[in-house]
């Protein structure tokens, strides 16, 4: 039976590019995941939100956008823009509120098939525990290192690191 199934595989064939797997092929068949919960951060409230919402909608999913409670206005403006699109009713849902109340309800709802989240490692662990381990896509707790080579001008390095760490009040994963 499995051999027969191989004859009916549909999708796009892509050659593997991972070292050690050259020449291997993968079959990619894009399919909607269902309902995608997008939990977005406060430090990049518009760009990260758009990067989570747009692909989910484009792939045919229903989206629930739960922005950071500290910075919901950018997401609300994006929600207004999305409301102008010709989407089916219920395809996009904007749900602001505190993570400890609204977020926990959404994360634990069995109708959510996938959760995409950008935030702290602690919040990510909490979401993973509450979600029942549905499909998770997370970018958590980034701390960009500063690699300093022996021949670097230390005065220039110190200035660049200080400047980077103070941008956005240091609240970005690529601060240094």
Per-segment meaning from a language model:
Residues 39, 66-68, 95-97, 117-120, ...:
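Generic beta-strand/beta-sheet core signal
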Residues 114, 122-176:
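ALDH superfamily catalytic-core signature
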Residues 30, 47-50, 69-72, 76, ...:
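Glycine-rich phosphate-binding loop at the start of an alpha helix
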Residues 3-10, 82, 86, 110, ...:
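Structural signal for hydrophobic packing residues in well-ordered secondary-structure cores
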């Amino acid at each position: 039976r499995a051999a027969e199934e191989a004859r009916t595989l549909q999708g796009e064939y892509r050659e593997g590019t991972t070292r050690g797997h050259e020449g291997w092929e993968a079959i990619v068949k894009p399919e909607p995941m269902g309902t995608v919960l997008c939990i977005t951060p406060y430090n990049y409230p518009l760009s990260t939100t758009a990067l989570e919402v747009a692909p989910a909608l484009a792939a045919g999913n229903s989206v629930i956008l739960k922005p950071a409670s500290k910075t919901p206005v950018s997401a609300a403006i994006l929600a207004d823009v999305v409301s102008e699109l010709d989407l089916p009713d219920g395809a996009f849902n904007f749900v602001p509120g505190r993570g400890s109340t609204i977020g926990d309800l959404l994360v634990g709802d069995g109708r959510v098939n996938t959760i995409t989240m950008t935030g702290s490692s602690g919040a990510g662990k909490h979401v993973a525990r509450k979600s029942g381990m549905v499909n998770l896509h997370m970018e958590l707790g980034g701390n960009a290192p500063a690699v300093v080579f022996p021949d670097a001008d230390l005065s220039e390095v110190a200035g660049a690191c200080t400047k980077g760490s103070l941008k956005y009040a240091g609240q970005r994963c690529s601060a240094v």
